Structures are given as structure tokens and as C-alpha cells.
């Protein structure tokens, strides 16, 4: 098997909008997409017709996928002859409606929903073209929830994003959206490390790390209790389960006890 095409790289980090490097996003027009509560999933086909697949953290053997990815890998295999050589398709996998934290009404068609298609390293199809490609393949794609413009202040745009989160039902039904991802309409907006710049805002339910009491630690508080109170949250526990599922360590059976 040849090495994966150049576009098959790790997906850039999506910065929280409070991150200092994310401020540059509000100087350019942005699209707003729904953030789906699934497992990140990328796939491409090389010039020899070989399939390359990865989750957020690991490569996936197409012939021996972890259980949580099996249905999505089966979908990709069926589409093998229709994929553009050298393009990397990126999406979220949901093995079942309650894949991670949110319990949706349904899974996407084929258990994978696209959010980006790269035709070269750091060069992505526009949302409208990504939607056309998804339709050609018979896959779903995340919805476009709005546009933001630099003529508005960052505070105004963040308030608009929060309103979207608070009022928008997920494409998959059953829940309000987990959050939103914002991306530049045009290419060439990068972070200090040269990676494509993107940002996210998630609902309060998904704020992973915060002080359990909301107050500063007192002198004399046990440091282990302080750390435990900060990190022992439902969202962080669910994220740990997600990582175990991506690694094939969780099967949703009694065997999971002790995982």
C-alpha cells in the first residue's frame, strides 16, 4: 500500500472562540456549521485504489475496524469506486443515536455525516461544493446554520452564535445542537503555526473543565480534592468513554466493566 495522499493529514485543531489565536477569525467572513456529537472520521483513496481511514487519534484498518466504526467503514467501502482519488473526506461517525453524550433521534445515512472535504493539504471545498459532493455520494453533511461578517463586532457575532446554539434543533433530531463550528469563507486564514484557522462554541453542557464549586480554591484545601473537583465532570467522563470506543475498547456489553 502506498503512503496516504498529501491531503490525508490530521485535521487542524478547532479552537475555542475564547482562545487568543481565534480572534483573527472575526476579521473575515465566516460560515457557521452544526457541531455533531460523534467520533471524528477521515477517509481517502490513493492512486492504487487503496483505502486509508483514521479516527481523530488512530489509523483504522479497513478490514478490522473497531466496533464503533464498523458500519461507517462498511459505507466507505461501498463508496470506494466513487471517491475522488487524493481527496480526504472528513466527518463524524455515529454508531447509534446515543453515540456519545447526546441522544439524537437517528444516525446519519451510512453512519457518517460529512463536515469537510480536502482536495489538497489545508485546501477545502466550499460548503456548497461539499454539500454537492455529499449528495453525489449519498451521504449527509452538516447543515449551514448561518454566516458571520467582520462588519459586526466579535461580541455581537458570539452572541449570534449563542442564540443559534440555544434555539436550533440538530439535523439528527431529538436535541438542540451540541455547538457550532465557524470557518473562513475564503482560504488562507491560518493560525501562528500555519494551520487552517477554525473556531468552535459549544453549549454549556459540553464545557468540559471548570471548577465544581465555581469559587477559587482556599488555602488548606486538599490539592487532590481540588483537582478531582475540577476534572471529575460528566462531560469529561463521557469524553473518556468516547476515546475508549474509538480504540475499540468499548463494546456496549458487560465486557466493558473495568474498561
Where in this protein do the model-derived segments appear?
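Core nucleotide-handling region used for phosphoryl-transfer chemistry
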Residues: 1-259
Amino acid at each position: 500500500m502506498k503512503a496516504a495522499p498529501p491531503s490525508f493529514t490530521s485535521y487542524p485543531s478547532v479552537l475555542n472562540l475564547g482562545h487568543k489565536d481565534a480572534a483573527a477569525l472575526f476579521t473575515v467572513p465566516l460560515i457557521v456549521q452544526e457541531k455533531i456529537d460523534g467520533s471524528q472520521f477521515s477517509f481517502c483513496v490513493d492512486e492504487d485504489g487503496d483505502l486509508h481511514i483514521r479516527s481523530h487519534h488512530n489509523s483504522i484498518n479497513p478490514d478490522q475496524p473497531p466496533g464503533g466504526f464498523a458500519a461507517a467503514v462498511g459505507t466507505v467501502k461501498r463508496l470506494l469506486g466513487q471517491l475522488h482519488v487524493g481527496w480526504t473526506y472528513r466527518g463524524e461517525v455515529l454508531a447509534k443515536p446515543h453515540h456519545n453524550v447526546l441522544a439524537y433521534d437517528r444516525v446519519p445515512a451510512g453512519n457518517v455525516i460529512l463536515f469537510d472535504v480536502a482536495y489538497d493539504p489545508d485546501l477545502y471545498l466550499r460548503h456548497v461544493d461539499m454539500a454537492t459532493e455529499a449528495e453525489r455520494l449519498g451521504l449527509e453533511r452538516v447543515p449551514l446554520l448561518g454566516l458571520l461578517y467582520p462588519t459586526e463586532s466579535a461580541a455581537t457575532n458570539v452572541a449570534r452564535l449563542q442564540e443559534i446554539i440555544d434555539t436550533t434543533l440538530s439535523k439528527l433530531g431529538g436535541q438542540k445542537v451540541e455547538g457550532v463550528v465557524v470557518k473562513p469563507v475564503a482560504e488562507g486564514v491560518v493560525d501562528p503555526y500555519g494551520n487552517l484557522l477554525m473556531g468552535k462554541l459549544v453549549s454549556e453542557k459540553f464545557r468540559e473543565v471548570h471548577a465544581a464549586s465555581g469559587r477559587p480554591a482556599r488555602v488548606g484545601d486538599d490539592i487532590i480534592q481540588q483537582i478531582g473537583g475540577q476534572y471529575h465532570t460528566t462531560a469529561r467522563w463521557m469524553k473518556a468513554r468516547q476515546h475508549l470506543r474509538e480504540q475499540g475498547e468499548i463494546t456496549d456489553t458487560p465486557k466493558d466493566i473495568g474498561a
